[in-house]
A protein has these predicted regions:
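Metal/cofactor-centered catalytic core regions of large enzymes
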Residues: 1-573
Length: 573
């Protein structure tokens, strides 16, 4: 007899993802990913001035803040042939690296670590033994017996109160929690440290972008003025603060995040380096231009595609080509003028809503019909995984440094083969390794910015194309970026300085989309197939694999038998 687990919503932060998984014989045999909230931003920005669009589309997500604004200004700049000043490029890179550091660290600790860490077990730990172990792993100054004891006492009072708050509804005591009490205490202490740390690193966004979340951008560069000696500009004191926060972030990542990641990976590697691989194709648009955005070879993150996990070849990708990227709606609640089986390149994309699903509230979706608000993108008819793992795999296949050396070093430390990358654990580790590189890149770009300023170059924007007497009848462009969660593309079509069409193909579109008309699964659905479930009432294994994609999720799980009959409800954090 099979059971169907319904996870809806799969994230409280954004609240728009539902997963239905069929379990048979203790293993997931089928899975369906459904976006349950329609995204209307693309229609909202129609007929607006393209120079204003970044401020609207940036609000599509408050978690990976700023990256949609960056993709939007890049799309307009691409359409109009605008080249931004080197200083603006450096500032954009710094802000993006800060986003990576913040997002990956918060994901690991606040959104994913508790899938591996048993907080209740930490209450049984010996703080002295935990501190000694932590000191062996890292020179982090807070790894002391006194600090661990004090934090454990706080946790005990928290639990004794009966109000667990953020730790409520966990699967504490689940047999697949494998860390020792001391390891659990280390990770829990650092979980709380990460909460404090994350509010500091985003001050860099406030300096350069005016605020966080949703810092300011401008078509042609950045809207901030830098003058080392001017009190009302970003001066030497403000830049000193930026450097301080970047250095603090690097220390936290290298002395807390990475050691904890390796500690956890060592415990779970035998099982979880073989589970959750999913699709076998990986896409990266590349990002972090060292020079001009058009000089793709200079990117810190390379562009390309790896097919069928073949690390001997990287295939080129052209987002402008109508023969490469298309979006399909066969299982999505939209309609195309050419019919449900048509595939459209985003320049020709349509956003016509057509909900045909059950009237809420409902128990199960009709997965043979349309079942999601997410379209299904394909590259030459192939599904792709995007995100930190995809970026790392493309870089590794390309022989790009430092990615290749860091991956090889980590695999040696964990005594794992390269194939271990294609897994839930590999996906989780990729975020941490990328975070480590982002910390180095941020300081590298900062030092280059300072050098430019010292050489007398203070330009922050190219306003030559800001105003024209006569706007062209037709312009189009694409803004490519690598968001923390993966490949991001904004496509814009402009007629006489007004947006005619705007389409966003975002990381979640690639990863969380429904299967195509041929029944080929996308990343989320595919990664769940074959996952063993110890206890359907506590489906910890599902959380581990889905969380590894970083959808910022917290779930409410309902169980049904094969006929859709209600069996049990499980609340998760």
């Amino acid at each position: 007899m099979s059971e169907r687990i319904v996870i809806d919503p799969i994230t409280r932060i954004e609240g728009h993802l539902r997963v239905e998984a069929e379990i048979e014989g203790g293993t997931i045999k089928n899975a369906y990913s459904s976006g349950t909230m329609v995204r209307g931003i693309e229609n909202i920005v129609k007929d607006r001035d393209p120079r204003d669009v970044w401020a609207f589309v940036g609000r599509v997500c408050g978690v990976c803040t700023s990256i949609h604004s960056l993709a939007s200004v890049r799309a307009v700049e691409n359409a109009r042939g605008i080249v931004i000043p080197p200083n603006a490029s450096m500032v954009r890179n710094i802000m993006q690296a800060v986003l990576y550091m913040h997002d990956h660290t918060v994901h690991f600790y606040q959104l994913h670590a508790l899938d591996w860490v048993d907080v209740v077990s930490a209450l049984k730990a010996d703080p002295k033994a935990a501190a000694l172990l932590a000191q062996q792993l890292s020179p982090w100054a807070k790894n002391t017996e006194g600090y661990f004891t004090a934090t454990q006492e706080r946790l005990k009072k928290f639990v004794a109160s009966g109000q667990l708050g953020i730790f409520a509804n966990g699967y504490w005591g689940h047999p697949d929690y494998k860390l020792t009490p001391e390891q659990n205490l280390i990770a829990t202490v650092h979980y709380l440290d990460a909460l404090e740390w994350q509010k500091e690193v985003v001050k860099v966004h406030a300096v350069f972008g005016g605020k966080n979340p949703h810092p300011n951008y401008i078509v042609g560069g950045m809207p901030c003025s830098i003058d080392l000696n001017e009190a009302n500009a970003i001066n030497a004191d403000r830049l000193a603060l930026v450097k301080q926060k970047l250095e603090e972030a690097k220390t936290f990542i290298n002395q807390v995040y990475i050691p904890d990641l390796l500690m956890i990976a060592n415990v779970y590697k035998d099982k979880w380096s073989k589970i959750g691989g999913g699709v076998r194709n990986y896409l990266s648009y590349g990002d972090y231009p060292v020079f001009d955005l058009g000089e793709v070879e200079s990117y810190k993150i390379p562009r390309g595609i790896v097919l069928d996990r073949d690390l001997s070849k990287v295939h080129p990708v052209d987002a402008n080509s109508p023969e490469e990227i298309k979006e399909y709606i066969y299982h999505s609640w939209y309609k195309y003028t050419q019919g449900d089986k048509a595939g459209l390149h985003p320049y020709e994309g349509e956003t016509h809503l057509e909900y045909t699903g059950p009237r809420p509230p409902y128990k199960l979706l009709d997965v043979e019909d349309k079942y999601s608000w997410i379209k299904t993108p394909r590259w030459k008819q192939e599904p792709m995984e995007v995100g930190p793992l995809a970026r790392l795999i493309v870089a590794y296949a390309a022989g790009k440094e430092p990615q290749k050396s860091i991956v090889d070093e980590t695999l040696r430390q964990l005594d794992l083969p390269v194939d271990a990358l294609f897994s839930t654990l590999g996906r989780t580790a990729a975020s941490g390794l990328e975070c480590r590189m982002a910390a180095d890149w941020a300081l590298e770009f900062f030092n280059q910015l300072i050098k430019n300023l010292e050489n007398g170059d203070s330009r922050m924007a190219n306003s030559a194309e800001w105003e024209r007497e006569n706007w062209p009848d037709h312009e189009q462009g694409v803004g490519l970026a690598e968001a923390p969660r993966g490949a991001l593309a904004h496509f814009i079509v402009i007629d006489k300085n007004r947006v005619k069409n705007y389409q966003m193909v975002v990381p979640t579109t690639w990863n969380a989309s429904p299967r195509d008309e041929n029944g080929v699964l996308s990343a989320y659905e595919s990664a769940l197939i074959g996952t063993p479930i110890y206890d359907p009432k506590q489906p910890l294994e599902i959380l581990r694999t889905i969380h590894s994609f970083d959808p910022c999720l917290a779930c409410a799980v309902h169980l049904y038998d094969e006929e859709g009959k209600y069996v049990h409800q499980v609340d998760t954090f």
